[in-house]
C-alpha cells in the first residue's frame, strides 16, 4: 500500500495493523514514523523533485494507493500509474466550491468538477462522489477505482470484489 502525502501516518497505521506492507511518502515523515514504525517511509519533496518511486524509468506499483487532502496536478498521472494490475486507488481531496467554506481556497488546490474521473479514465471506477461533507464543512471529490488485473481479457466484464 502506498500513501502519498502520508502526513501523520494514520492510513499507514491502519493498513499495517491489518498486516499489509506499507509505504509512505511525505516531505516530513517524523509523525508517520511514530504512528507506523513498520512502514517504509520516503522523505521527499514530491512537488520539486523527481518521483522517488521510479528507478531507471521503471515506476514502482502498489496493490493500493491512498491519497487524502492532497493535490499536485503534475503528479496525477503518476499516482494513477502507481496502481498495480488488480490494485485499487482511493483518492479524496478538496474540490471547487470549498473556497466558500474555508481553506484551501486557491484553485490550484481544488479539483474541478469531474477532474478525478478524467484522471482515472484508464481505471474501472467503483465509486465516485463530489459534494459537501460536514465537521468540518468542506467540498470534496472522492473516488475508488480498480486497475484491471493482468488476466482481465479472459473475463473482461467480471471484476474481483473483495473487502
What feature does the model see in each segment?
Residues 83-84:
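Helix-to-beta-strand junctions that scaffold the AdoMet/dcAdoMet cofactor pocket
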Residues 2, 8-48:
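Class I SAM-dependent methyltransferase SAM/SAH-binding core
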Residues 87-94:
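Conserved beta-strand signature within the Rossmann-like core of class I S-adenosyl-L-methionine
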Residues 71-80:
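A short, conserved alpha-helix within the catalytic core of class I
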Residues 134-163:
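Core SAM-dependent methyltransferase catalytic element
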Residues 108-122:
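Short alpha-helix
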Residues 52-64:
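A short acidic, Gly/Pro-enriched loop at the edge of an enzyme's catalytic core
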Residues 124-134:
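Conserved S-adenosyl-L-methionine
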Amino acid at each position: 500500500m502506498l500513501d502519498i502525502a502520508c502526513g501523520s501516518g494514520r492510513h499507514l497505521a491502519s493498513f499495517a495493523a491489518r498486516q499489509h506492507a506499507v509505504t509512505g511518502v511525505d516531505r516530513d515523515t517524523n509523525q508517520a514514523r511514530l504512528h507506523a514504525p513498520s512502514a517504509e517511509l520516503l522523505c521527499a519533496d514530491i512537488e520539486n523533485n523527481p518521483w522517488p518511486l521510479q528507478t531507471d524509468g521503471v515506476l514502482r506499483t502498489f496493490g493500493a494507493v491512498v491519497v487524502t487532502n492532497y493535490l499536485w496536478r503534475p503528479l496525477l498521472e503518476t499516482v494513477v500509474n502507481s496502481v498495480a494490475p488488480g490494485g485499487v486507488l482511493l483518492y479524496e481531496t478538496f474540490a471547487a466550491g470549498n473556497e466558500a467554506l474555508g481553506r484551501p481556497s486557491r484553485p490550484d488546490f481544488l479539483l474541478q468538477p469531474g477532474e478525478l474521473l478524467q484522471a482515472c479514465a484508464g481505471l474501472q471506477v467503483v465509486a465516485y462522489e463530489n459534494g459537501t461533507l460536514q465537521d468540518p464543512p468542506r467540498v470534496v471529490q472522492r473516488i475508488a477505482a480498480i486497475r484491471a488485473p493482468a488476466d482481465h481479457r479472459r473475463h473482461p466484464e467480471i471484476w474481483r470484489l473483495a473487502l
